[in-house]
Amino acid sequence: MITANEIRRRFLEFYKAHGHEAVRSSSLVPKDDPSLLFTNAGMVQFKKIFLGQEKRAYSRATTSQKCLRVGGKHNDLENVGRTARHHTFFEMLGNFSFGDYFKEDAIKFAWKFLTEELKLPKERLYATVFRDDDEAEQLWLKHSDIPAERIYRMGEKDNFWSMGDTGPCGPCSEILIDQGEHMTCGPDCGIGKCDCDRFLEIWNLVFMQYDQDATGKREPLPKPSIDTGMGLERITAVCQGVFSNFDTDIFQAIIQYTCGLANVSYRSDDETDTALRVIADHSRAIAFMITDGILPSNEGRGYVLRRLIRRAYRFGRLIGLTDTFLHKTALKVVDIMGDDYPELRENSDFMARVVREEEDRFNRTLDKGLSMLEDELATLSASGAAHVPGDIAFRLYDTFGFPLDIVNDIAEKRGFSVDEDGFKALMKEQKERAKAAWKGSGEKDIASRFQPLLEEGMRSEFIGYDHLCGEGRIVALMDEHALAVERLAAGQKGYLVTNRTPFYGASGGQSGDIGTIASPSGKVRVVDTIKPSPELVVHHVEAVEGDILLDQEVDLTVTEDDRVASARNHTCTHLLHAALRRVLGDHVKQAGSLVAPDRLRFDFTHIAPMTPEELAAVEREVNRVIMADIPLETDHMHYDDAVKRGAMALFGEKYGDEVRVVAIADESVELCGGTHLRATGQAGLFLIVSESGVAAGVRRIEALTGWNAMHAVLAQRSEQAQLSAMLKARPGEIVSRVESLQKENRTLRKDMERAAAQATSGQGRNIMDEATDVAGVKLLAAKVEVPNVKALRDLMDDVRSKLVSGIACLAAVDGDKVQLIIAVSKDLQTRFTAPQLIKDVAAEVGGSGGGRPDMAQAGGTNPAGIDAAFAKLRSLIGG
């Protein structure tokens, strides 16, 4: 039986033999496409090439791209595990032509690979073409053994592809395989008639031959291109003769491993099988997402990861996995796929720790959710309700990750039904809000703004590694809206491109240079420098003298102090990265950075806050290398050679075949295109000013170097002198003096709390006299004076200890706010619950609240409504 690994290998080798460059899979996080949450197709990393915004050294490529689809038109998460072919993570095999070959070779290659390499039976293969694509049909007849009756013409919905409303587009041709009559769904089964799995699409060939404008008009592209995609999981199922992707070797190793953990069998019952498939699928997604730098959080990509971890964990509970297990199944993914994706092995320890921590966190959350559901069911039972409202089910899902089926299961056992329609309506609202709120990854899509320049093939030669000034010619001039102009006059802002420039364009976390550009007729101040593509540098300018004209010869001068300050911070960023790995461990990976003239910021993967001792050790390490005054070496080499040398490739960065390596002896070797110092001693001083968390598993260090670090040290010295004077203590005595003051403060605070407790206890005895009888229920409703909410709760505890049977309501005013607490004795909870009562009572003071059946708390903003609130409570009890 051919394995998935063998299919992947054969595919890449086949296309390499036909002149294609085998390109590494890009990250699941699309670096240059802010419109996408995740990489969801093989063409994503080549999008700029198709759009004419980027050139590469090759014109044909092949990849096995890791992809993620978790919603929208591509995938409904709730279907994963329940169908044969829905997945979150998958691999897309693809071949691409960038103005090289077109339809004929694309069809020839595909047919040859399927029938000669994979040896699929020719008589079971079908093809579809776009309804107007006579050329594609003739090519299928010419280069394959598919007869005309097995070639179907389809409409635009099925067989026409576009990148968006405008841009490259074209017809496509799908290859399908007949899986046999036993898969027939009915008398109307057939291609274009149904969606069953008898005629299974295995490969899509996209022929990009048009450019569509905003009106929908399509013009032929000067260089048509090819984009194909074939899911590895699907073609593996076909080759292995199974009808579910989950029955392939890709998933079975994980499924059988999970069976061993849970002591269950696959193919025993639908519920168990679904759980095992979900765990296998999500384990793959989780392992790759964390490896690509995504960490659990409550928004964006991190929220998707958190949902997948929690969904898989819940399904584990359904098959008896009560302890944490998902970190183990994720490590199984590393065992299976680590040879083909080495980054999995490099990050396996950290990945497993992140999953384990998230499992532990969810375990605690689940217990809280179950408690909340029990409270809600008790309240509903007391009120005689038979249905769980949709908003309660949704709140449990949204807050605690409870799926509807778990709520249904628990509710059904207690005799309740669940308002599923209400739940689904709220889910729909949330999805629409999330869709509206998604503004992209936060990156500015600079390339699209300068699309015309890129399409013209405009390039800039960067000379700034060796020079801070130089001569060049203005080859493009634009106004502040990036529209082409002939001149910029004094006071006008705009953009300027020269054929040569010493200005560094913002990229790799480093800020763009500032400076001046002067011509014989005028001068502009460069306020920023941006880099829309690897070959193009654009100066954001403001004209300050005379006129600047298109096609003028100019002198370009970078502001030296800012460039050197940025170089200090960039070199120290490399030293910081290396020091963190030495002090904390090799799991540390860069998760983001900012290199500006005034500071550096470095985000990195690490579970826990750093201790003062660890921070001091990192600071010492960086300064040790600075004081050693080690020369920096830069070199250009092939990516594979750089990696063999030990150079670190940073998360989220895209690298070509030729890379620049920055080495600081044996201390640090990284792939980097930024500007650096000549030797580490030029950094002067490195000072960490803060360490904080920015997301689960991601820490941030902010630091200063050079003169900025020196100024900070002098400021700290001045502040220390002020503290010494205020505390009347010498510098070495400041800490002990503050400790003494804190001890004194704690003593005074305890004295105050003791006095407040004595006053509260006496108040509890006094207000018991205010209790009245309402419809046979003893009711105490009193307005009290307490210093804080804790004292109010303590007072209620005192009242409850004295109130054997009855209901108590205490109200306390704090400025323009009100706090209410209601308690219900156990014998009355079949008639009244505290959350049920406080909902209407709190409304009278402009508030709301909730709690347990025996006690609930609320806050309000209308102290004048307290009497009305007490009256409302009496009416509720009196019926």
UniProtKB/Swiss-Prot annotation:
PROSITE patterns: AA_TRNA_LIGASE_II_ALA. GO terms for biological process: alanyl-tRNA aminoacylation; negative regulation of DNA-templated transcription. CDD domains: AlaRS_core (cd00673). Its EC number is 6.1.1.7. Zn(2+) binds at residues 570, 574, 672, 676. Keywords: Aminoacyl-tRNA synthetase, ATP-binding, Cytoplasm, Ligase, Metal-binding, Nucleotide-binding, Protein biosynthesis, RNA-binding, tRNA-binding, Zinc. GO terms for cellular component: cytosol. It comes from the Bacteria. Its main location: cytoplasm. Binds 1 zinc ion per subunit. GO terms for molecular function: alanine-tRNA ligase activity; aminoacyl-tRNA deacylase activity; ATP binding; tRNA binding; zinc ion binding. Its cofactor is Zn(2+). It is an enzyme of class 6 (ligase). Coiled coil: none annotated. It is found in: Cytoplasm. Pfam families: DHHA1, tRNA-synt_2c, tRNA_SAD. It catalyses: tRNA(Ala) + L-alanine + ATP = L-alanyl-tRNA(Ala) + AMP + diphosphate. Catalyzes the attachment of alanine to tRNA(Ala) in a two-step reaction: alanine is first activated by ATP to form Ala-AMP and then transferred to the acceptor end of tRNA(Ala). Also edits incorrectly charged Ser-tRNA(Ala) and Gly-tRNA(Ala) via its editing domain. Belongs to the class-II aminoacyl-tRNA synthetase family. Consists of three domains; the N-terminal catalytic domain, the editing domain and the C-terminal C-Ala domain. The editing domain removes incorrectly charged amino acids, while the C-Ala domain, along with tRNA(Ala), serves as a bridge to cooperatively bring together the editing and aminoacylation centers thus stimulating deacylation of misacylated tRNAs. This is Alanine--tRNA ligase. It comes from Nitratidesulfovibrio vulgaris (strain ATCC 29579 / DSM 644 / CCUG 34227 / NCIMB 8303 / VKM B-1760 / Hildenborough) (Desulfovibrio vulgaris). The lineage of its organism: Bacteria, Pseudomonadati, Thermodesulfobacteriota, Desulfovibrionia, Desulfovibrionales.
